[in-house]
């Protein structure tokens, strides 16, 4: 459950380390984002030699949330941190590697490139 001003870790090697959610995309009254949702973020911490710089405004897809997500079969999935993967204008990941597991809901949201790069899909 990601909303405005939520801080997220970055799960790729784009150069950014921490993001802050500015807006949840998908309607003017939409308040929360979950796994597989696209959000607009500001980069709060970044590596000095990375592709993404501090202060940049980027779009990202949520791949891990601390708030549990209920699946269709009744099971719940939750992670230890909130994390996102930074996207370019074509909704492809900016980084070439993904760190940590990603939720299966990312696959249902048609982010196949992220799913194929991820070491584990839960």
From Swiss-Prot:
GO molecular function: large ribosomal subunit rRNA binding; structural constituent of ribosome
Assigned keywords, A-Z: Ribonucleoprotein, Ribosomal protein, RNA-binding, rRNA-binding
Disulfide bonds: none
A Pfam short name: Ribosomal_L14
Gene Ontology biological process terms in this record: translation
One Gene Ontology cellular component: cytosolic large ribosomal subunit
Subunit relationships: Part of the 50S ribosomal subunit. Forms a cluster with proteins L3 and L19. In the 70S ribosome, L14 and L19 interact and together make contacts with the 16S rRNA in bridges B5 and B8.
Free-text function comment from the UniProt entry: Binds to 23S rRNA. Forms part of two intersubunit bridges in the 70S ribosome.
Protein known as: Large ribosomal subunit protein uL14
Native source organism of the sequence: Campylobacter fetus subsp. fetus (strain 82-40)
Phylogenetic lineage: Bacteria, Pseudomonadati, Campylobacterota, Epsilonproteobacteria, Campylobacterales
Gene of this entry: rplN
